[in-house]
Amino acid sequence: MNEKYTVKAVFSDIDGTLLTRDHVVTELTRTEIHKITNNGILFTLASSRSPAGIEPIIRKNTFNCCMIAFGGGLILDEDRKIIYEKGMDIYMAGKVIEYIEKNCADVTWNIFTADTWIVKDRSDQRVQHEEQVVETSAKMGTIKDLKPYACVDKILCMCAPQKLSETEQAVRQAFPNLSVAKSSNTLLEIMQQGVNKAEAVKRLCEIKGIRMEYTMAFGDNYNDLEMLEAVKYGVAMGNAPEAIQKKAAIVTKDHENDGIAYILE
């Protein structure tokens, strides 16, 4: 770890941050992450992905790390034990799905629990693309396929870039008590109120006995902003929107040029 920073915990977003456009971790970045974990620094992947979508990255790169999934709705420790979960109940999730189908044209919904990914149509090209990116498969179904007491960790909306802001505004107005955040120019995350990466980072640090003044985080998008502002050293990637870069404490190189390693080495 760079001697300029006194850090005991490092948190990293995945897509657009840890991974290149080819969805891989570079050798240099992998090496630097191994170095910090070998030196006793807590490393955690903080993503909007499901645990099943995060696990292949951990396995391929032999990371010893915790996992923040669903944009902060679920935390798993190094042994993949759930240590925190905050999601919607079935009734609320059903109301959101009903609203999307009635009011948001050409928007594909996805329902996520800790171990299930349900979609209306697996032949949808947007779903197929997401399956390839996260290396896991969705199941066709409806909200009724879940058990009555299930915890819905996230509803993901997929739409064209030009429809994203419109969809976000509509969902926010219809459900002011839910957390709504863009994770890319085509993806909208809908979660329980109070769910975000920053709150999950704080919760994990509390569990691990680490003070926030010893934390660092890397991110590239709007759903990372609260996390970047919550930690001591918030690092925006060089490929992040200008608005994110302006609010971050540090700006590094982009995800194609080892932005994480540049700060850690």
Model-inferred region functions:
Residues N2-A9, V25-T26, E189-E265:
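Mg2+-dependent phosphoryl-transfer enzymes with acidic/Ser/Thr/Gly-rich catalytic loops
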Residues T6-D22:
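Asp-based phosphoryl-transfer active-site loop
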Residues V24-R126:
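Active-site phosphate-binding/coordination module
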Residues I36, S47, G71, I155, ...:
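Residue-level signal for inorganic ion chemistry
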Residues G40-T44, F63-C65, D153-K154, E213-Y214, ...:
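Short active-site oxyanion
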Residues D106-F218, L225, A230, N239:
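Conserved acidic, metal-coordinating active-site core of Asp-based
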